[in-house]
Amino acid sequence: MTMVQSLWRKRASAALEEFRITLPQYLLIQLARRRGAIRPSEAAEELASDRPTLTLVARKCVARGWLSRLRVKLDRRSHLLRLTGLGEELLDRIEAARVLGPEALGDPLDVLDSEERAQFLRALDKVHRRARDLF
């Protein structure tokens, strides 16, 4: 699966170049859209990123105006990341261009018939649950 992920990330990164956004930046602002305001530590965990890397990505997103930082009232050292209107507009443009869907990037599972696909997805789900238990 790592090889498939690597190939997908490479194609997705190339598709995002015209929008002047990196894949990690896109994933972070997409997460902020889904979750609303989110702590950087939670974002790092959800995106399987280390905190220093996520911090750099977040700073760039804030500098570009796609995210804003909100101070947490009870803990002034802590902050949340929230999608801005500019970030929302960027996501809308990317989605409208349909550059990240299977029709643009391809679907590696299209070589499987429906039964094979169902078996594969069940097996993948089983491996995913086991990995969660282990890690």
Task: State the predicted function of each range.
Residues 129-135:
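Short, charged, intrinsically disordered terminal tails
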Residues 2-5, 30-34, 95, 125:
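Short, locally clustered residues in the helix-turn-helix/winged-helix DNA-binding domain
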Residues 34, 85, 132:
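Short, conserved catalytic or interaction motifs in soluble domains
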Residues 59-122:
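Charged, amphipathic alpha-helical coiled-coil/dimerization segments
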Residues 40-41, 52, 59, 79:
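Residues within helix-turn-helix
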Residues 6-50:
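N-terminal helix-turn-helix DNA-binding core of bacterial DNA-binding proteins
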